Swiss-Prot record:
Chain ranges passing through the membrane: 646-667, 707-726, 734-754, 774-794, 928-951, 982-1003, 1349-1366, 1378-1397
Organism: Rattus norvegicus
Glycan-carrying positions: 678
Binding site for Cu(+) 1: 18-19, 22
Subcellular location: Golgi apparatus, trans-Golgi network membrane; Cell membrane; Melanosome membrane; Early endosome membrane
Chain sites annotated for binding Cu(+) 6: 567, 570
Residues annotated for Mg(2+) binding in this entry: 1293, 1297
Residues with the Phosphoserine modification: 270, 339, 353, 357, 362, 1422, 1424, 1452, 1455, 1458, 1461, 1465, 1468, 1478
Keyword Heme on entry: no
Protein name per its UniProtKB record: Copper-transporting ATPase 1
């Protein structure tokens, strides 16, 4: 491959992200942009790193694309960095199945492909790729007819430069790491961080307490690296901002361009070098054959490597190389560089061998599936001279770095060191000498012998086999485990479908599907089947499936408190013991915090096992207690805080208000005296100063000002403490909020008053200054009251979520059973200690702690708080139970299937939490407005101050006329300043961005909470807002409009009743169909069992199935069945009847009290055998049976109604006709009618045939139908409707509808019970009720209406309140004091929250409420009113409106055609339809018994 630079990388700062949902949204949306190859978004660093094609995108366009999503995107550095790309040369190896244009288009659409050049004449293609995004092997897999061109590849490699272009876009990061005490600490950090994907290199310095890291920002962020270091137990701090760098010469050498191996593999490598050596590497991180191919491709092309064999099963690679040109360490790094961060490579063994030896020649031709196993030995060395744990750590740190040492554990107590090592790389003697070199006395045990390592010399026949001296063992099948992300599941039937079909496949041992998590865990034999094949099998079932590469590790995380540790030796003892346990991936113990962080595989080991292991070491371990309560949702702490602040402020505010009222009364009294006696200004001053409160204690300090100051101080700095904290935090983060405004207003008023009071005292003024000490107490009283009421209201908005969280159980009773399922012991454990597979006992009245399956017992379970299902649900062995539901009567034993965060309840809680914290698009407008609001208000306040000062000095009469409480004892200048200052502070007090900020989130929280209580899960603000804009509702048919399972509609007996009875026919048919796996057969069997009131049927032999036609078999042993069953009396036993129609649904027959049966039947030993045929017309004709015209016409009528008609023959005589159909849900017609009455267009879209679709549409009242639409075409249909300018809601059961649900403006998934498809839709209806579709749109409209009302309140309040406060309306007498402004401000926030709480009064309309409407408004339609569109084409096929003569002609033609052929054209069916409504209510009713 030839390196070049056709891609750039840019890092964009993104503001406005609040949660991981924002990160996913940006990655999904920008990832779809044309020209974007890869994007990595970091919430912590508020940045997005994008790899893109510079020919299609620029940094500016990417910034604008993120801006358009509602986030603030900033380009601090607009200069992009180049990203390494490679050139792949492809050639045609077989006749092309696809045209060149299609191949080029396919390749260009692939992420990571930057360019494609096609040469049809030379039958080749040149593809430019980004190797970190897509590999050459993946390109070849996309186009099977093309393969890598080795000739061109080698030619290009030979002419290339000595050094390839370095990987651009790498970043250098330096971090300060505290708490490191020895080299073991540095090794731990380097080992942990060095394995992370995206980390290229790391060096930790113990002396400098510093880590230097080189990483790729598009794969990992600095914050993630910091978290990983802290997870090990060391505090880490970023010293300086990361900066981009270029690689050095050594790294350039490692990345040197090399040709790709030939298609023959590594076997056709260049001849061996004179000094060839063979080495075995252990490789962790390989998941599939693609990994094997990538490593072999990369290594086999290096000049100094003669051959390589990689084994996926043994996780190893054997490399033959020239030891004079390259070292094993370079080879190890070369393997890790194939996919940085994915592979973890260690050296297992190295054997030098001359090239002429048999082993070398055999190694070149080594088969892929044969590899030597790495060999390890253990030695115990006696060590004397150790005095403390520092000695222990020193020995462990030095020896652990020696080549070949796998692990070391030094015991200070026993004076020993236990070392596990690779005997091919080292031996006990060098290890003993190394310890002695450190100053200790080291002695090997007396009986110590050098381990004998037998290495089998590989031969041509058996290369690198183990020693032949060992007995040959029978290989047991290997079990591997993989995880597959499954999308499109909506209910338990989807789960059962996947599990049932996968278990049938060879090589698959077990399957466990988690519906809520959308994940399947599969155990398989890697020699038989691979994960990608399993994913393809799931896709064939109609679901989306992707192999989760890294899901197998770290899927269990445990936080423990460990008590009893005293030193670092204790820490090491716990860590080394646990990491040796199978199933534990990682363990980190922090001595300072007494905490252990453990990652484990729940399938192999559980939390109780880990705690027990630590206990056996002499320590006490317990779970870190987590707050499972919903206290953070009910705002109790905030309510208590603001209540305290309000009471403190109120305590000091009441005297201040008393003083203010007293002064207002006295000022009014003086003004009256002045008006009556016309006193001079000097007399007014004397009169004013003679008042008690105006008397001066000190010159310039009056009693009034002193009392006001003393009362203001505690309020300002105690009652207002929380405001100062919040304001400081806001300003520190360079933002301004409501708290900043409040602190500004109160601090300015307090500081101004204090300054002028001090100045007056300094000048010994005779006239007391006018102060504003009364402003802060009054402001804080009303603001604290507002916050108190606001948090009380907010607590109410989260009641639904708090109720869900409170359902979670805290403890579980785990029982132990013996082989006979008898109870041996019980144990109460914390619910977080429950492991998958545990047997749990749930007593009556108890909560189910986890999801599980009942293994013993019967009971009724209340699931109403989770599913909304009012009636208790019966549970028996095999039934699934949900965490949080309540057991009513009867004890149950359940086996845990999903625990911890995987339970259904946890997933629903997580979904509702994410929904309530997500933002609606309308909220983005409010957020931007609030961002500019505070600076704008501060500016308006300053302008108000200046304007009134200017007006006052220009025209004092205006201030004199409108200044409340003005008297001439105050100087003009002081009056002007006081009036302007008062207006300015009032503007600060009355302005409130809080009401804007609360308008949307409070309504969204209440709306989603109310929805959850009513079984409607809405995923956040965006779908909640979007649903009210919907103009078209598209329904899927199967499982949505209909029940999704076929049922028997009618049974017609076609023989005289004295020949064979109806019940006998049902017994024979039920027995015959019981062996069928076809859904129609299952429906027939179920119906027969219900009619005969039995669970057992006869015996079926010689069963044969002919797909597309029917079945044949022989039935016996039905006489006993008929004798035991409580059979019904035959009605109207008319001998001349040739056909009896019996309704399968509404028939009501009284049970017979007696039955006449021939004695020989009941007592017969050899029962009669019946030859049975069941199937369609073609099956009957094949078997030589003649179908009469009457029967054929009856079948035509059923088929016209969208039913499947099957015929039954017993002993070569046509005996019955059975009509089967998927029935319409009872509420479907009502739901469609209501949606239409709401002004919405309703469309039916189905993959079924047009006849069935037309029939269903006519029953529910839908006039527009898209029939015979493939699942892949449903997306196109939705998109087509959207292109017409319509907002589309897609309603489906999610099995084949998930792409269309994702494409729709609002995707609504209908589930049964709690089985919810959280990835397939925006709105999930827990109950299988179509009226919830109406309720979800109705709730959306109510919520959006409430949001708009809230915005009107907030905007009108600010638009009117601010001008009033600024004094604009003084001419009409509107004047506000600062305390009035603060009261109004508090009232605005409370009013918005209370307005949102009105949504809690919402009641979902019920079926009974809807049924109160007049029955004349039913929505059934005649065929002529229905427009059917077939397939992907948009050609409308309207039913023709024919005249009477045309109808008679067409009916006759249809009858003649029915005798000639079994296939009906669309037109013949459509024209032969009578009016549907007349059929449903007229003579041809389903509950009639018709005799032909």
């Amino acid at each position: 491959m030839e390196p070049n630079m056709d891609a750039n990388s840019i890092t964009i700062t993104v503001e406005g992200m609040t949660c991981i949902s924002c990160v996913r949204t940006i990655e999904q949306q920008i990832g779809k942009v044309n020209g974007v190859h890869h994007i990595k978004v970091s919430l912590e660093e508020k940045s997005a790193t994008v790899i893109y094609n510079p020919k299609l995108q620029t940094p500016k366009t990417l910034q604008e694309a993120i801006d358009d999503m509602g986030f603030d995107a900033l380009l601090h550095n607009a200069n992009p960095l180049p990203v390494l790309t490679n050139t792949v040369f492809l050639t045609v190896t077989a006749p092309l199945a696809l045209p060149w244009d299609h191949i080029q288009s396919t390749l260009l659409k692939t992420k990571g492909v930057t360019g494609v050049k096609i040469s049809p004449q030379q039958r080749s293609a040149v593809v430019t790729i980004i190797p970190s995004v897509v590999s050459a092997n993946q390109i070849v897999e996309l186009v099977p007819d093309l393969s890598l061109d080795m000739g061109t590849q080698e030619k290009k490699s030979g002419t290339s430069e000595e050094h390839s272009t370095p990987q651009a876009g790498e970043v250098l990061l330096k971090m300060r790491v505290e708490g490191m005490t020895c080299h073991s600490c540095t090794s731990t950090i380097e080992g942990k961080v060095g394995k992370l994907q995206g980390v290229q290199r790391i060096k930790v310095s113990l002396d400098n307490q510093e880590a230097t890291i080189v990483y790729q920002p598009h794969l990992i962020t600095a914050e993630e690296i910091k978290k990983q270091i802290e997870a090990v137990g060391f505090p880490a701090f970023i010293k300086k901002q990361p900066k981009y760098l270029k690689l050095g010469a050594i790294d350039v050498e490692r990345l040197k361009s090399t040709p790709v191996k030939s298609s023959e593999g590594s076997q056709q490598k260049s001849p061996a070098y004179p000094s060839d050596s063979a080495i075995t590497f252990t490789i962790d991180g390989m998941h599939c054959k693609s990994c094997v191919s990538n490593i072999e491709s990369a290594l086999s092309t290096l000049q100094y490597v003669s051959s390589i064999v990689v084994s996926l099963e043994n996780r190893s690679a054997i490399v033959k190389y020239n030891a004079s040109l390259v070292t094993p360490e370079i080879l190890r790094k070369a393997i890790e560089a194939v996919s940085p961060g994915q592979y973890r490579v260690s050296i297992s063994s190295e054997v030098e061998s001359p090239t002429s030896s048999p082993s070398s020649s055999s190694l070149q031709k080594m088969p892929l599936n044969l590899v030597s196993q790495p060999l390890t030995q253990e030695v115990v060395i006696n060590i004397n001279g150790m005095t403390c744990n520092s000695c222990v750590q020193s020995i462990e740190g030095v020896i652990s770095k020696k080549p070949g040492v796998k692990s070391i554990h030094v015991s200070l107590t026993n004076s020993t060191g236990t070392i596990e090592y690779d005997p091919l790389l080292t031996s006990p003697e060098p290890l003993r000498e190394a310890i002695e070199d450190m100053g200790f006395d080291a002695v090997l045990p007396a009986d110590m012998k050098e381990p004998l390592v037998v290495i089998a010399q590989p031969s041509l026949e058996t290369p690198l086999l183990p020693s032949t001296t060992e007995p040959e063992n029978v290989m047991t099948p290997v079990q591997n485990k993989c995880y597959i992300q499954v999308s499109g599941m909506t209910c338990a039937s989807c789960v059962a479908n996947i599990e049932r079909n996968l278990r049938r496949e060879e090589g698959i041992y077990s399957v466990l599907v988690a519906l809520m998590a959308g994940k399947a865990e599969v155990r398989y034999n890697p020699a038989v089947i691979q994960p990608r094949v399993i994913a393809e099998l799931i896709r064939e079932l109609g679901f989306g499936a992707v192999v989760m590469e890294n899901a197998g590790e770290g899927n269990g995380i445990l936080e423990l408190v460990v008590r009893g540790m005293t030193c670092a030796s204790c820490v090491h003892k716990i860590e080394s013991t646990l990491t040796k346990h199978k199933g534990i991936f990682y363990c980190s113990v922090a001595l300072a915090t007494n905490k252990a962080h453990i990652k484990y595989d729940p399938e192999i080991i559980g939390p109780r096992d880990i705690i027990h292991t630590i206990g056996n070491l002499g320590f006490e371990a317990s779970l870190v207690k987590k707050d499972r309560s919903a206290n953070h949702l009910d705002h109790k702490r905030e309510i208590k805080q603001w209540r305290g602040s309000f009471l403190v402020s109120l305590f000091f505010c009441i005297p201040v208000m008393g003083l203010m009222i007293y002064m207002m009364v006295m000022d009014h009294h003086l003004a009256t005296l002045n008006h009556n006696q016309n006193m001079s200004n000097e007399e007014m001053i004397n009169m004013h100063s003679s008042m008690f409160l105006e008397r001066q204690i000190l010159p310039g300090l009056s009693i009034m000002n002193l009392l006001s100051l003393l009362l203001c101080l505690p309020v300002q700095f105690c009652g207002g403490w929380y405001f100062y904290i919040q304001a400081y935090k806001a300003l520190r983060h360079k933002t301004a909020n409501m708290d900043v405004l409040i602190v500004l207003a109160t601090t300015i008023a307090f500081a101004y008053s204090l300054v002028i009071l001090l100045v007056a005292m300094y000048e010994r003024a005779k006239v007391n200054p006018i102060t504003f000490f009364d402003t802060p107490p009054m402001l804080f009283v009303f603001i604290a009251l507002g916050r108190w009421l606001e948090h009380i209201a907010k607590g109410k908005t989260s009641e639904a979520l708090a109720k869900l969280i409170s359902l979670q159980a805290t403890e579980a009773t785990i029982v132990t059973l013996n082989s006979e399922n008898l109870l041996l012991s019980e144990e109460q454990v914390d619910v977080e200690l429950v492991q998958r597979g545990d047997i749990i006992k749930v007593v009556p009245g108890g909560k189910f702690p986890v999801d599980g399956r009942v293994i013993e017992g019967h009971s009724m379970v209340d699931e109403s708080l989770i599913t909304g299902e009012a009636m208790p649900v019966a549970k028996k062995p095999g039934s699934t139970v949900i965490a949080g539901s309540i057991n009513q009567n009867g004890s149950l034993l359940i086996r845990a299937t999903h625990v911890g965060a995987d339970t259904t309840l946890s997933q629903i809680v997580k979904l509702v939490e994410e929904a309530q914290t997500s933002k609606a698009p309308i909220q983005q407008f409010a957020d931007k407005l609030s961002g500019y609001f505070v600076p704008f208000i501060v500016l308006v306040s300053i302008v108000t101050l200046l304007v009134w000062i200017i007006i006052g000095f220009q025209n004092f009469e205006i201030v004199e006329a409108y200044f409340p409480g003005y008297n001439r004892s105050i100087s003009r200048t002081e009056t002007i300043i006081r009036f302007a200052f008062q207006a300015s502070i009032t503007v600060l007090c009355i302005a409130c961005p809080c009401s804007l900020g609360l308008a949307t989130p409070t309504a969204v929280m209440v709306g989603t909470g109310v929805g959850a209580q009513n079984g409607i899960l809405i995923k956040g603000g965006e779908p909640l807002e979007m649903a009210h804009k919907v103009k078209v509702v598209v329904f899927d048919k199967t499982g949505t409009i209909t029940h999704g399972t076929p049922v028997v509609n009618q049974v017609k007996v076609l023989v005289e009743s004295n020949k064979i009875s109806r019940n006998k026919i049902l017994a024979i048919v039920g027995t015959a169909e019981s062996n069928s796996e076809h859904p129609l057969g299952a429906a027939v069997t179920k119906y027969c069992k219900q009619e005969l009131d039995t669970e057992t049927l006869g015996t079926c032999t010689d069963f044969q199935v002919v797909p597309g036609c029917g079945i044949s078999c022989k039935v016996t042993n039905i006489e006993g069945l008929l004798h035991k069953s409580n059979l019904k009396i035959e009605e109207n036993n008319i001998k001349n009847a040739s056909l009896v129609q019996i309704d399968a649904i509404n028939e009501q027959s009284s049970p017979s009290s007696s039955m006449i049966i021939d004695a020989h039947l009941s007592n017969a030993v050899n029962t009669q055998q019946y030859k049975v045929l069941i199937g369609n017309r073609e099956w009957m004709i094949r078997n030589g049976l003649v179908i009469s015209n009457d029967v054929d016409e009856s079948m035509i009528e059923h088929e016209r109604r969208g039913r499947t008609a099957v015929l039954v023959t017993i002993d070569d005589e046509l005996c019955g006709l059975i009509a089967i159909a998927d029935t319409v849900k009872p509420e479907a017609e009502l739901a469609v009618h209501i949606l239409k009455s709401m002004g919405l267009e309703v469309v039916l879209m189905t993959g079924d045939n047009s006849k069935t679709a037309r029939s269903i549409a006519s029953q529910v009242g839908i006039t527009k139908v898209f029939a015979e639409v493939l699942p892949s075409h449903k997306v196109a249909k939705v998109k087509q409707l959207q292109e017409e300018g319509k907002r589309v809601a897609m309603v489906g059961d999610g099995i084949n509808d998930s792409p269309a649900l994702a494409m729709a403006s609002v995707g609504i998934a209908i589930g049964t019970g709690t089985d919810v498809a959280i990835e397939a839709a925006d709105v999930v209806l827990i109950r299988n009720d179509l009226l919830d579709v109406v309720a979800s749109i109705d709730l959306s409209r109510k919520t959006v209406k409430r949001i708009r009302i809230n915005f009107v309140f907030a905007l009108i309040y600010n638009l009117i309140g601010i001008p009033i406060a600024a004094g604009v309306f003084l001419p009409i007498g509107l004047v506000l004091q600062p305390w009035m402004g603060s009261a109004a401000m508090a009232a605005s926030s409370v009013s918005v929250v209370l307005s949102s709480l009105f949504l809690k009064l919402y009641r979902k309309p019920t079926y009974d409420n809807y049924e109160l409407r007049p029955r004349s408004h039913t929505g059934q339609r005649s065929p002529s009113e229905i427009s059917v569109h077939v397939g992907i084409d948009d050609t409308s096929r309207n039913s023709p409106r024919l005249g009477l003569l045309d109808r008679i002609v067409n009916y006759s033609r249809a009858s003649i055609n029915s005798l000639l052929s079994d296939k009906r054209s669309l037109n013949s069916v459509v024209t032969s339809e009578p009016d549907k409504h007349s059929l449903l209510v007229g003579d041809f009713r389903e509950d009639d018994d018709t005799t032909l």
